[in-house]
Amino acid sequence: MLASPEPKGLVPFTKESFELIKQHIAKTHNEDHEEEDLKPTPDLEVGKKLPFIYGNLSQGMVSEPLEDVDPYYYKKKNTFIVLNKNRTIFRFNAASILCTLSPFNCIRRTTIKVLVHPFFQLFILISVLIDCVFMSLTNLPKWRPVLENTLLGIYTFEILVKLFARGVWAGSFSFLGDPWNWLDFSVTVFEVIIRYSPLDFIPTLQTARTLRILKIIPLNQGLKSLVGVLIHCLKQLIGVIILTLFFLSIFSLIGMGLFMGNLKHKCFRWPQENENETLHNRTGNPYYIRETENFYYLEGERYALLCGNRTDAGQCPEGYVCVKAGINPDQGFTNFDSFGWALFALFRLMAQDYPEVLYHQILYASGKVYMIFFVVVSFLFSFYMASLFLGILAMAYEEEKQRVGEISKKIEPKFQQTGKELQEGNETDEAKTIQIEMKKRSPISTDTSLDVLEDATLRHKEELEKSKKICPLYWYKFAKTFLIWNCSPCWLKLKEFVHRIIMAPFTDLFLIICIILNVCFLTLEHYPMSKQTNTLLNIGNLVFIGIFTAEMIFKIIAMHPYGYFQVGWNIFDSMIVFHGLIELCLANVAGMALLRLFRMLRIFKLGKYWPTFQILMWSLSNSWVALKDLVLLLFTFIFFSAAFGMKLFGKNYEEFVCHIDKDCQLPRWHMHDFFHSFLNVFRILCGEWVETLWDCMEVAGQSWCIPFYLMVILIGNLLVLYLFLALVSSFSSCKDVTAEENNEAKNLQLAVARIKKGINYVLLKILCKTQNVPKDTMDHVNEVYVKEDISDHTLSELSNTQDFLKDKEKSSGTEKNATENESQSLIPSPSVSETVPIASGESDIENLDNKEIQSKSGDGGSKEKIKQSSSSECSTVDIAISEEEEMFYGGERSKHLKNGCRRGSSLGQISGASKKGKIWQNIRKTCCKIVENNWFKCFIGLVTLLSTGTLAFEDIYMDQRKTIKILLEYADMIFTYIFILEMLLKWMAYGFKAYFSNGWYRLDFVVVIVFCLSLIGKTREELKPLISMKFLRPLRVLSQFERMKVVVRALIKTTLPTLNVFLVCLMIWLIFSIMGVDLFAGRFYECIDPTSGERFPSSEVMNKSRCESLLFNESMLWENAKMNFDNVGNGFLSLLQVATFNGWITIMNSAIDSVAVNIQPHFEVNIYMYCYFINFIIFGVFLPLSMLITVIIDNFNKHKIKLGGSNIFITVKQRKQYRRLKKLMYEDSQRPVPRPLNKLQGFIFDVVTSQAFNVIVMVLICFQAIAMMIDTDVQSLQMSIALYWINSIFVMLYTMECILKLIAFRCFYFTIAWNIFDFMVVIFSITGLCLPMTVGSYLVPPSLVQLILLSRIIHMLRLGKGPKVFHNLMLPLMLSLPALLNIILLIFLVMFIYAVFGMYNFAYVKKEAGINDVSNFETFGNSMLCLFQVAIFAGWDGMLDAIFNSKWSDCDPDKINPGTQVRGDCGNPSVGIFYFVSYILISWLIIVNMYIVVVMEFLNIASKKKNKTLSEDDFRKFFQVWKRFDPDRTQYIDSSKLSDFAAALDPPLFMAKPNKGQLIALDLPMAVGDRIHCLDILLAFTKRVMGQDVRMEKVVSEIESGFLLANPFKITCEPITTTLKRKQEAVSATIIQRAYKNYRLRRNDKNTSDIHMIDGDRDVHATKEGAYFDKAKEKSPIQSQI
């Protein structure tokens, strides 16, 4: 009998151990083993380092076969491991390979040693990198074939080594068992065939060599495991991808029905009556309509002007008519003429790539009414899909993070135990070390103890001690001798004197002032700059270099060189000083101007005095280190995509370049060489891909370009989004990192405190007229401004303040711990946000209501709490937050205001006992009743909406509409008087103090002032600018509607704490802006040909002087680009366009072509300036965006915790409605229809209510959608007739369905909303089929019927009808819908205000660039169209370009605008910049919070699943399924249906089949007839999910009480047995039956063989079942609880 082998440490793998393992595995296969739950140990996976708990690795164990240390492989798999000298684990199959090579064969052992050797892996990695470098080269050297053959030989040798070491296929860990080896083998085979075959293969196959780049991934274990995680994420995203395709298909079909063929409508030149006869004759020629020169083109446009036949569509100029002719725009690739191109256009809209052009094209061709379609697709649908991807990825990331955390928790005890063992041996080791040292130093003893020297543990300890020393000992002696200056006493006195000066607080204050002044001097550089300014800046630079040099010298004297360079900030300061000195020395050397760029490093000196800056920089560096594998994987993918694109399309761009450029020159964006291909891939990842895809399809075709681009878009965006989530999580976990303790920050605080102390002293002395300031006052000043230490404050604290001081004893300890634990993860902690595991939504809302009542009753105490919870006495941001909270919350307490009315002390101290006093009190009470009356509030709300709505009529046509103008003037007067009256009533009711202490009333007061000023502005001509302040009137809406109040409060809470981080981000942008000024100032000027509007070639015009010399003959223009880097302000604006990817291509083109100041730009002469913009997008956009969103999410979670886990963007009423919404989402609210008694009707009822009938209807809907996809713009008459009859057939089928349901449901048919919807679809479909026969197909297009029928596809999203994955993905959106609607209301209000402001300021701007007939500010509707476009960050650069037309050469300031007195069409650049920048920031902030709301809903669901808590939703789902199994509401189901019922439930109550054993183990009570009660099943399933949870008893009691309330007449039947007992009885009966049969068999020998064959299997099965259920009974925890 063989013993079960157990691994003990590292044991050599021998033939004996091999036989032992084989016998053990064979035995476990034959026996009923108990180790089914055994899984591989994560720390012992292939490629990881062997943990140190397994001891040291002796020399004889390196590269030698060892017994597997993982119990899973040791007991279940026939494997062994091999370790290299780096302790890396390699696992091999122990079976013989190639039928002869056993693990002990010398050939196989040699190949294993080669394979595991670190040098072999390094050699392969170097070979791959060399191959990558040569694959990126366009012009290869002559010796390329030699190198390629050498690399091919290396890869072939590697494959042979792996084959001999691992085997080909059989067993675990074989060569072909690894997918990466499949890739490597396939690429090598392709390369051999292509290289040595005489045939010419397809060029595409030659690109297979680029797959070799991916070989970097398996050579790095971190990359390999990360790819596995991303593949797991992709699996979870499958449902999202399917739903995305579903919605894209629906919108594509709608687009086909609305816009098919419309984009071919163009303005065509049609001969007039007075034109010659020749032209009339030409129009009869069919080729005339195809000639492109007969179309109308706008100036500078490549494609003809689109038009439409609707009144709100684009109109043609005089002499042109709108006809359908020519091809579609954008080289024919933009259209809705077929399903494929419509899908392409919708995908482009969803990705929001260049949407403004498609948006304008459709509105020109079809009309502005279709703006609704774009709002739904570009904003709502795009937002929803992005939220889905982010939510699912966030869930996957958190699951992976939790999995790693659980693994580390399991392994931690082992490491702690090992650490204890090592710690116990420390004393003995130290004693032995001391003995050795004593013997070494003793002159008597020369021998050492051999047994001590041979101690392996002691040697290991000594090696660790040696490794801690960074430098050799002689370097420390050198530093002590030469770098520590303790010379003469005079030097020590001088050093002490310098130390006092340089370390004084005011010295640091002086230095920080110098740093700020230096930054200001850096920002003053501009172009053109006068000589005086240039001289001033140079002198300033010399002064600052001198100051920083003196600081360094004095600190070296005060601290010694050794102490000085021990501080990181001092090393950084010395680098800045050395750079400044080197720059001075090389100032006149040609080519050294780039040294000026390193001046930007001086800005980072602020981090020494700015803790937030310092901590964020540290968090950034730590995050990059932690995420190095993810960054490396992203770079590998970009490199591979660039090389693959270059190999696949490079030759096509060279051969077919004339297809995309009229001059047959390569465009800026192509893939002919590696660098341009790399830039193209980077542009795709930035979201700008459609224009380069058009060019690619022109030169290489659609079959290869579209798959390549889809691959880059999907995989690249997955990597970028995953990196973004990892950064957000990393920043969130780094927020507890404390700032480094430095004296400079403390000294700065002390200096500021002393200055304030002195100022207070002087003020007190002046005010009090005394000689001495009271000591208590001065002590208070010191206590406020002098803090202990800035280093103890975390990132989360520093993000909540603008000052550098922080009081550490202000916040409550409990709340702080809860917040810190919560913010460690993206998922809110359920222990904080959920107090009860069942019906958490209800309990939260109920508790919240109680809290609201308590807060209303104790308002004064709440204000005291606000003051106590202030995180810093000196923090301006915290003060602002507390004031906002007080003004917004305090003003809403009507009780507080009513108390103020009764007191009556704020409007005069009139005694209430006098007659006048009583009259005054009665007046105030009356006013209070009026303003508190609900009807008065509704009236004021209505007047507010009317006064806001009237602003929409004040457009450029108002002067032509005299009646409307007069009505609006009277309305303004009435509204003004009403609001003044309301203000006076509230003054009388509440008093001045109460009124002006409320923030909303202060806002109302400001709006009333605006009303008054606008009326005053109409009276005097010089006061007319006051009228434009009307745009502030809609702000009053905020104070009238609770939903907007809630959103504004939430935005203030989540946004104000980010100001400090926002300032840090601005500093990063400032660095890039100053760099841009140094690189590009004055270099964006170019000589423009006025006739063509294009730039002159540099070969014709070399510089500015040449251009000006041509100016005398022709009107040549030496113009500057509107977006430039001539100063820091322009640099910020240009960087904002790059950050929003609007106009960034134009800016980069100007930078790439720039040569020097006053030199004509040349095409791509400075191409590597792309690196500047790439670095800005990474370090100036991506990373700061991650930091900002991290802080916003942290504050979102903090305030959500304060509200008990409720959403901070919904009102109290909406929180109650939230429960109802969840109930609607989880259950079907319709009442069941009774089954008819008639047999025929009953049969039809059973048919239409069956699941099969529902499936058939869904299939019909899908087939009908597929039939619509066949339709095209240009198709044969036969196809049109066939599609007509197909639509008719579907209409008949849906009519039959409607008739069958009418027969089955009778009058109950119309009680179901979905049936009414289907009935209306049938009616409209029949009408749509019949109308064309009477009124013609022009008035009723055939697509109308198709769109009506398509509306039925919404059934796919129904709960319980469509796919379950759709419901799960729609759930978070629907649950967050109330909050989203509130936020959308605020967005609409912001758009309304900005639309009115735009009409007042930009209505008459010249139509150019982004301002055209569709997008302009002439009317309110057009302004809203523009602002919607800007809200999705599309095309605002073009609008700003048009507004920048303020010079006489660009616009006409005296132009007469018909119908109005306004003159000119010039813009106002400063107002335009403020307008667009502010709107972009506000809309970005609001939209980011929209994303956070939906993503947090996803994570809340994930949090509940993770913690195995059962919510009310889970129980609703349970009873919903129960209705299907118990339609008669008996509260019982048959035990035979229990298995199906458990499998039909949703997780976590779900039990997958086979589940009979688990159900029997639950030991459920059974009544007569083998029936089981609903409550018993629910309780048992709940206990199975929650286990031994401490909340179990409370949950059970709530379930029982809730069930009794819902079912007061419980049908009770006494249980007669249980499921476990019934199974035991059945097993016992089987055993008795088997014994009796055996007895009969022994007596009847003739029938033994036949009966034995029948019953033998039954005996074995019964025995196993009996053993299983005996074991289940012993182990069942639920049975013991019952």
Curated annotation (Swiss-Prot):
GO CC, one annotated term: voltage-gated sodium channel complex
UniProt effect for mutating residue 1492 to E: Increased non-selective monoatomic cation leak channel activity
Phenotypic consequence of residue 1189 to T: Increased non-selective monoatomic cation leak channel activity
GO molecular function terms attached to this record: osmolarity-sensing monoatomic cation channel activity; sodium channel activity; transmembrane transporter binding; voltage-gated sodium channel activity
Cysteine pairings via disulfide bonds: 267-307, 658-664, 696-705, 1087-1107, 1451-1466
Listed Polar residues bias regions: 820-834
Membrane topology: Multi-pass membrane protein
Mapped I repeat ranges: 100-401
IV repeats by residue range: 1233-1531
CDD domains, sorted: Na_channel_gate
Effect recorded for residue 724 to Q: Increased non-selective monoatomic cation leak channel activity
Glycosylation sites: 276, 281, 309, 1103, 1113
Catalytic reaction equation(s): Na(+)(in) = Na(+)(out)
II repeats (start-end): 487-758
Regions crossing the membrane: 118-137, 142-167, 179-196, 201-219, 238-259, 368-407, 506-521, 531-559, 569-586, 593-609, 627-655, 702-732, 935-953, 962-990, 999-1020, 1022-1040, 1056-1080, 1168-1202, 1251-1272, 1277-1305, 1313-1338, 1342-1362, 1378-1402, 1469-1504
Record comment regarding domains: The sequence contains 4 internal repeats, each with 5 hydrophobic segments (S1, S2, S3, S5, S6) and one positively charged segment (S4). Segments S4 are probably the voltage-sensors and are characterized by a series of positively charged amino acids at every third position.
SUBUNIT field: The sodium channel formed by SCN7A is probably a heterooligomeric complex consisting of the ion conducting pore forming alpha subunit SCN7A and regulatory beta subunits such as SCN3B. Interacts with ATP1A1; activates ATP1A1 and thereby indirectly signals to nearby neurons to regulate sodium homeostasis.
Name used for this protein in its record: Sodium channel protein type 7 subunit alpha
Annotated organism of origin: Homo sapiens
Species classification: Eukaryota, Metazoa, Chordata, Craniata, Vertebrata
Gene transcribed to yield this protein: SCN7A
